A protein has these predicted regions:
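Active-site-adjacent structural elements in folded domains
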Residues: 107-110, 160-166, 218
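Glycine- and small hydrophobic-enriched segments that form the cores of compact globular domains
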Residues: 85, 114-119, 131, 135-142, ...
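Generic N-terminal targeting/processing segments that precede catalytic cores or assembly contacts
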Residues: 1-108, 131-132, 241, 248-291
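Conserved phosphate/anionic-ligand binding catalytic regions in large, soluble enzymes, centered on
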Residues: 107-125, 169-174
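Glycine- and acidic-residue-rich phosphate-binding/metal-coordinating active-site segment common to enzymes
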Residues: 144, 150-163, 167-177, 182
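Functionally critical mobile loop/hinge segments
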Residues: 184-291
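Alpha-helical support elements that line or immediately flank enzyme active sites
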Residues: 123-134, 179-187
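Acidic-glycine-rich active-site phosphate/pyrophosphate-binding loop
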Residues: 87-104, 139-158, 203-211, 246-249, ...
Length: 291
């Protein structure tokens, strides 16, 4: 995918009178020299892995550190007992985000979308729609192309690495990708997809990367839920015609600049934020002693 800006993606779709997913697919084919069949096969494979990760979730399994595991099952049980807000879809989004992120912490196979630390966001918003029959696999894969297109632009203009840009570059980027994907899935225009992505990333601007004990567990797993729910809200706003004052490319550029301004302590080093709290330090010391 050779797009270096969201505006370039939108222009390609407009000029050829094709969907945003098709414009991104064509760009990918031109760059990768794959056939359309091969490219789509690869995207379907990624989707199948996302589905498998959810199926493979074990509610009794805990991560090696003991910091994570079992929370997705708690949320699911609470919703079934009528002890949650937001309806079935929001409960499933929360559950799926936790499932995938917990599987990552337990060393299971996930799709880095765009990173392992933010792996729960994109599947969380799509899996419930697939299971409910609201989107078939072909439509889901088109949405994944849209997500990938925005992810590529973020990578090109800023960064996807928490070590470089903080959690805004990981969960923030994943949230933007998911918002655009959801918008496309409901028939949103390319411009609405870009607005959804801009809102989602803008809402998480400045989010730091402060993993306790340097592990992708606390607070990373719960932030996947925030990224997913944020994506849903932003997609809803964009589909309603709500615009964002700052163009998507400028939001991405701002994220890159904010990331460069963050202290190294807040960029995946485990030296600041929650990692530097008394409890965070005690956890790190305990795990070091047990190693």
């Amino acid at each position: 995918m050779s797009f270096l800006s969201c505006e370039e993606m939108l222009a390609a779709a407009r000029s050829q009178n094709i969907s945003l997913a098709e414009a991104i697919l064509r760009s990918d084919l031109a760059e990768s020299r794959l056939t359309e069949e091969a490219s789509r096969h690869a995207m379907h494979h990624l989707w199948h892995v996302m589905e498998a990760t959810s199926r493979d979730y074990d509610p009794v399994q805990r991560s090696r550190s003991g910091l994570s595991g079992g929370d997705a099952a708690k949320v699911e049980q609470a919703h079934q007992a009528g002890k949650s807000y937001g309806g079935d879809y929001l409960a499933e989004v929360t559950t799926e985000a936790l499932k995938t992120a917990e599987c990552n912490a337990c060393m299971k196979r996930i799709v880095a979308a765009p990173t392992a630390g933010s792996c729960g966001v994109l599947p969380a918003v799509l899996l419930p729609l697939s299971r409910a029959g609201e989107a078939d696999e072909e439509a889901i894969c088109d949405a994944l192309y849209v997500a990938a297109g925005f992810g590529q632009v973020i990578a090109a203009r800023a960064t996807l690495a928490g070590a470089e840009g903080g959690c805004q570059a990981e969960v923030g980027a994943a949230s933007a990708m998911a918002a655009a994907a959801l918008c496309h899935l409901k028939g949103g225009t390319p411009e609405q997809c870009a607005a959804a992505a801009a809102m989602a990333l803008g809402n998480l601007l400045g989010l730091v990367c402060d993993p306790v004990a340097g592990l992708v567990e606390v607070p990373c797993i719960k932030r996947n839920v925030v990224g997913a729910v944020n994506a849903v809200s932003c997609a809803n706003m964009a589909l309603a015609g709500v615009d964002y004052a700052i163009p998507c490319d400028e939001v991405i550029d701002a994220m890159g600049r904010v990331g460069s301004l963050l202290s190294p302590d807040l960029r995946e080093t485990g030296q600041g934020g929650l990692a530097a709290t008394p409890t965070g330090v005690r956890i790190a010391e305990r795990l070091a002693e047990e190693a």
